[in-house]
Every structure is written in structure tokens, then in C-alpha cells.
Curated annotation (Swiss-Prot):
Residues 33-36, 105-115 are periplasmic. The gene is cbrB. The chain crosses the membrane at residues 12-32, 37-57, 84-104, 116-136. Disulfide bonds: none annotated. Belongs to the CbrB family. GO terms for cellular component: plasma membrane. It is a multi-pass membrane protein. This is Inner membrane protein CbrB. Its main location: membrane. It comes from the Bacteria. Residues 1-11, 58-83, 137-157 are cytoplasmic. It is found in: Cell inner membrane. NCBIfam families: PRK09823.1. Keywords: Cell inner membrane, Cell membrane, Membrane, Transmembrane, Transmembrane helix.
Amino acid sequence: MSVSRRVIHHGLYFAVLGPLIGVLFLVLYIFFAKEPLVLLVIIQVLPLFLLLSITTGAIPALLTGVMVACLPEKIGSQKNYRCLAGGIGGVVITEIYCAVIVHIKGMASSELFENILSGDSLVVRIIPALLAGVVMSRIITRLPGLDISCPETDSLS
């Protein structure tokens, strides 16, 4: 498979599924670590919660997917190293992205958005990014679309 196809495949899957894995973790974290009644409030605003998580997490997840797709063959072919690189890359890219967003300040228009991106809520940013990076790096080779051969690009390589 060509590198460009792998970059598109990994990037899109990471961007679509990565934030959803983060939301799943946050819902479980709120249910077990906080009051379970808070979960009822989140379920009531779940579409807004999903939209907010996708808008804040899709770009870092896309960049993490591109990074995992561009890993050298020795690292990318071994599951444990790929998961380690995906998890660390997810955290680093998410923190850089959040720092840029907070620095711009024009994009952080709502108070909720500013609270999520502030330094006070590391659990909301780092752990979902770490888990999404590890899980997506682990399952990315099993997702459909990776083994499709294309006669136009196969003849070029």
C-alpha cells in the first residue's frame, strides 16, 4: 500500500473514531469517579457533548493518524511499538493543539470550551487522547479499506 493511501486511511479513521473513544472514556470516568447523577445531565446534552468532543478532538486525532501512518516500517509493523507511539503522539499532538487554540483565544468563544482547554482539566484532555491513540493504533490495521488494491497506484510502485 502506498504511503499516501495509508495516510488517508489512518487519518480519517483516527479523526472519526478517536474522539468517540475519548467520549466513551469520559462518560465512564464521570460515572465511576464523579456522581452518577452528573451522567444524566451529560446524556441529556449528549449531541452537544459529542459535537464539542469531535470539534476539539478531530484535528488532533487526524494528525495522530497521519503520524502513525508515517511511522517507519520497524516501528509500525510491531503492535506494541505502534500503540506506544500512537498514545504518546496523541497526547503530544492534543496538548500542542490545545495550547494553540488557547493562545489564539478567538476560537475559544464559550466558557465551556475555555474550561475544557484550560490547564485545570488534564483528565479531560490527556487520558482520552492517550487511550484513543493506543486503541486506534491497535485496531487500525483491522479496519476495512487498508487492503484494497488500486491498479492505478500499484503500477507506479
